[in-house]
Amino acid sequence: MGSMIRENKQQMSDLYTKIANQIAGELPKDWTNMSVGFLVDESGFDTYLIYYSTDCGKSYRDFMEEVFDMDEPAEGVFEAKETCLELREVCKKSRDVWTGFALRVNRLGEFSADFSYEPIASFTPMQLRFWRGRYLK
């Protein structure tokens, strides 16, 4: 990202922190790493991914699969999706129209954010496998 950022850096950082905090509040207490993905295809359909690790990133679990099996709704997960949409709108206003966003966070609060700009016609298992291979390490 570096000097390529056209958006307000503090606003962007605040949104990253908000997303991380919204999701962290829903994860198991022993989480060590999380990776959040938000991908948008050409039709505007979005895919939302959340993976977490309890062993410092050696293996990851698909939190979205767990969310649908919970007795109580994981409100923070759905709030974070809304924050991802807000992030996308902030970027669009600066003519920074990305198709993919990834946020990686560890338990210490260290994070990295990455954006991709390749057009996505529609989501395929191969694209999701590529995303997991890139951001779950």
Model regions and ranges:
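Conserved aromatic-histidine-acidic binding/catalytic patches
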Residues: 7, 11, 72-75, 91
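Short, non-transmembrane amphipathic alpha-helical segments
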Residues: 17-25, 80-92
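Acidic, proline/glycine-rich low-complexity IDRs
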Residues: 2-3, 102-137
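Short glycine-rich, low-complexity/disordered patches
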Residues: 29-42, 90-106
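Short amphipathic beta-strand/extended segments with alternating polar/hydrophobic composition
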Residues: 51, 61-66, 114-117
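Short, hydrophobic/π-rich interface segment
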Residues: 67-87
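N-terminal domain-start interaction segment
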Residues: 4-5, 9-61
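Short, surface-exposed linear segments at secondary-structure transitions and domain or protein termini
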Residues: 56-63, 70-74, 121-127
